[in-house]
């Protein structure tokens, strides 16, 4: 928001929710994402980059309309993006008074993603920022089974009207040459996703070798989520389908990212299933997808979650969005996010070993005669170093089949360079 003190499009290390509030403004999307990240895991190094609203963007809005006649005093519990707002209700009072009090309660919480305006018997909630992400804000009553005061009826509409996400192109340019192991992407429109996927491919490629994995989330029906998954095909992007969760998709993506990266950085080959996503609220029981429905989503490039005892949301299977090869044939090569994570880890370990052991060495052919102490390395020496590294990775459970690797490994000088 405009209250943020940090310049736009400038990456900054963030260590706490309070710091995020100061840097990016209380109630901003980035503040909410970072607060969720630090609550889920405060030890993962996290950087943030703020972007401006699209100048042509519109803000999403929703309405709570009151009707009936309250016959018993109580409390009205409204949830905006999974965050509760409580409002006192007095038996027999005018509904306009309840609406005014509800709007005041919403505006009293500056961390909410919305502001409120009362008019007669209705309260209009408006997202603090412009863009499509505002349409994904959930608005409902009684998430945890609270009771609405007898006689009072509160009807919530869906958030609509948000248009035009920020253009991620400038943010991508601000990435620089730094390697970001996990990137949280809140904007899932086709244009922004295409731009990000292109950048990820460049970083994955041989010239940069600074691979990253992007984490996104999508809110919608089973059909809408399936369609979104089938429209993408990147092995470096994973998208969690949230269903009708009260928690916004951008929070899902942030918590999913920090949880997954904390595990992948420790052991990229270890599956992520059953890892809890702290602070994420599951859909209501009737809205949860069945196993058969989740299986459909997995085949459409959408990662799935499970709900454990106590309504704890956890990763079920973290697949990438990659589904078909260049011939449009089904290809499971990069099915799980662990595959690109493991490949990236192996490449990084290999580069690090060679750069550490032979940082400024001259390259000579095997059998070359040179004096002691010369900073010279030969293909056979490098081959031996790679085999030793593979043994270490094998002991760490990252790779297997050492004998096959040894037989297949060829290290030779480039005749043309």
Label each residue range with its predicted role:
Residues 1-45, 274-288, 292-417:
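Structured, hydrophobic secondary-structure cores that serve as assembly/anchoring elements
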């Amino acid at each position: 928001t405009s209250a943020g003190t940090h310049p736009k499009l400038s990456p900054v290390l963030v260590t706490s929710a309070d710091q995020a509030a100061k840097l990016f403004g209380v109630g901003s999307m980035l503040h909410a994402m970072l607060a969720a990240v630090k609550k889920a895991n405060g030890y993962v190094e996290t950087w943030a980059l703020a972007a401006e609203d699209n100048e042509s963007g519109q803000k999403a809005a929703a309405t709570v309309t009151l009707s009936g006649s309250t016959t018993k005093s109580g409390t009205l519990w409204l949830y905006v993006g999974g965050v509760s707002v409580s409002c006192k209700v007095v038996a027999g009072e005018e509904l306009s008074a309840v609406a005014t009090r509800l709007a005041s309660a919403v505006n009293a919480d500056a961390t909410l993603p919305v502001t409120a305006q009362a008019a007669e018997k209705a309260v209009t909630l408006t997202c603090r920022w412009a863009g499509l992400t505002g349409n994904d804000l959930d608005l409902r009553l009684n998430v945890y089974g609270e009771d609405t005061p007898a006689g009072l009826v509160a009807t919530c509409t869906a958030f609509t009207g948000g248009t035009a996400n920020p253009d991620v192109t400038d943010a991508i340019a601000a990435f620089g040459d730094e390697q970001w192991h996990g990137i949280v992407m809140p904007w899932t429109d086709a244009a922004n996703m295409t731009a990000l996927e292109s950048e990820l491919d460049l970083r994955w490629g041989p010239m940069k070798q600074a691979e990253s994995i992007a984490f996104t989330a999508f809110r919608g029906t089973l059909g809408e989520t399936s369609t979104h998954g089938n429209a993408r095909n990147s092995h470096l992007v994973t998208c969690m389908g949230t269903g009708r969760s009260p928690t916004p998709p951008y929070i899902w993506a942030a918590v999913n990212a920090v949880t997954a990266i904390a595990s992948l950085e420790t052991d990229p080959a270890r599956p992520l299933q059953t890892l809890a996503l702290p602070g994420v609220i599951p859909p209501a029981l009737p809205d949860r997808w069945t196993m058969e429905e989740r299986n459909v989503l997995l085949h459409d490039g959408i990662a799935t979650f499970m709900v454990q005892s106590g309504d704890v949301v956890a990763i079920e299977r973290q697949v990438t969005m990659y589904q078909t090869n260049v011939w449009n044939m089904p290809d499971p090569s990069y099915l799980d996010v662990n595959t690109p994570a493991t490949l990236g880890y192996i490449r990084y370990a290999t580069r690090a070993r060679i750069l550490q052991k032979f940082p400024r060495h001259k390259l000579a052919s095997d059998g070359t005669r040179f004096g002691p102490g010369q900073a010279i390395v030969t293909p056979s020496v490098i081959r031996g170093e790679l085999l030793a590294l593979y043994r270490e990775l094998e002991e760490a459970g990252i790779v297997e089949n050492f004998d096959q690797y040894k037989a297949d490994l060829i290290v030779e000088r480039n005749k043309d360079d």
